[in-house]
């Protein structure tokens, strides 16, 4: 009644006197008032419509609650009216929590025909949350089998779909044994297994249950739903499940959300279109929730009904009064890190596991938790959501691309926070990349690629590298650069994981580390070789584009320091198809970057050689002589180009730039031998011109032959002063004369000090 009174008062027009409004300002003011009045009238009509719908909903619920005898749908106009009302309101705005007790009891009690019960179950769309008590009550009706098997099946599908909307689950977990007893029903078995998969905790795994599942498997064969439950049992208690099960994650259960997903989407769309309309229908004290897409709703930590009694409106309550020592601390009240530390033993994860992704404190807690069921719940929910919401894997999902992009961004941020990838994301990428167009959610997909966990490269090659390479070769330059950036981050994440593992491993576990290290070395080597192959091809396709070359060299800047920086016994040189385009690049940034990379290769190889010669450490892995040979070939080519002007004569690499003098003379270039030294090199010629202008301001001939002898050394110092640090490090480390000169200079400075 209060709502109706308020709506009546809101209909009163503003009292504005128009008799004296003769000037323009008064006329404008009157127009503004008319606009406000019109908006207020529309709001009043909306409130009145909302009140009428709420009255209709209350009448419908009251009718269904009082049904005692079987009523025919065709003969009862009242039933038809209230059923239609219930369906229209549910599909439009969702049902309040208090409505589920009534409707579930009616649908499962068998008082009405299956046609009516089916329509009731399909209209059970929550506006906020589903009370746990209504689930317990409905399971009791489910057990007495008053309804048909088809209704039982539909109820299980509804329960699976709405599982994360249940406000609290302790009493539902207590029903584990009851659900388990229905496994013998072949029709219900797949869905019962699905419910059990969602409910299973370690304490639920018992020997008699394992035996029951094994017996069912021997009768029915290797059914996916039975494998799912057995895999979960084996994870919790490996000593109880001795059979071998498929290790690779797969889709164990069929999609059960049928009619409800479409209804949830419809509710979300209408509420977004009518954002100024009052909140969803509320009965009692239920709190309003925005009806977004199912996964989006789950990103908000829900307030559980079990903890609602602890909340005080308009006042404060001490923690000592609010929570006893054995009482769980509601996660929706978790605000600070000290709170997390004080209550970490009393925290309980929310029913909607998706909310963990957006809460840093819960992510911290998840990182500390040893409860495997927590990870399984999150991985299962995430895997299902990614599969169902993927805009290029599911028909008619293109309209939700912006939301899906936001969801992928949320998942990626959670992975960055935890510093590890989610297995469900890896599985999603392996399935979706062959269908991906390289455009939809490009940035987010490539970000997720960078967090794929380390696995055998044979699996990655067919499921990740092959589809990614197809897109790589057929897409734009900028897509190629994005892929290379993603693969560089993937390599860095693998290497960082290795460093963390080294720090955490003790000496006594070195033997077990060797197996892991061998797998890591092989996986990293395969990834580097893969990037080398696609980079070589990309440079041919893009005509050695400077922008592309920068990203390729950026990748090898990580590769060249693997041994010293990441403590991994591996060094792989870039292929000739990358090295020579960088050496002959027109851009000084790329040339400087290559010089720095070769300097770091030298530093790492010298350190590796010293460790091999030293008897203090037993080398489990040794670099092949081919690595040293390839490095030496590249050094000869670089020094021949940049310093001795003899690259065309001394380069001995099979894919190098060695050419006969007769062929070079035919080019018509006079100083072809000097074409790529530090004076004539296309990437450095602009520096040579500037140096000549500063050294000989009156000379306009730009005679590069003047840069020799002492002028050569002056020019070298000039280059160092231009920020070409990579060039400086390379020349001083790889050229004897300059190296000795720099050493003697350093010694002189030390003596002066």
Curated annotation (Swiss-Prot):
Keywords: Centromere, Chromosome, Nucleus. InterPro entries: CENP-I. It is found in: Nucleus; Chromosome, Centromere. Signal peptide: none annotated. Residues 1-54 are annotated as: Disordered. GO terms for biological process: CENP-A containing chromatin assembly; mitotic sister chromatid segregation. Its main location: nucleus. It holds the Pfam family CENP-I. GO terms for cellular component: inner kinetochore; nucleus. It comes from the Eukaryota. Residues 1-15 have a biased composition (Basic residues). Belongs to the CENP-I/CTF3 family. Component of the CENPA-HI complex, a centromeric complex involved in assembly of kinetochore proteins, mitotic progression and chromosome segregation. Required for the localization of CENPC but not CENPA to the centromere. It however may be involved in incorporation of newly synthesized CENPA into centromeres via its interaction with the CENPA-NAC complex. Component of the CENPA-HI complex, at least composed of CENPH, CENPI, CENPK, CENPL, CENPM, CENPO and CENPP. PANTHER family: CENTROMERE PROTEIN I (PTHR48208:SF2). This is Centromere protein I. It comes from Gallus gallus (Chicken). The lineage of its organism: Eukaryota, Metazoa, Chordata, Craniata, Vertebrata.
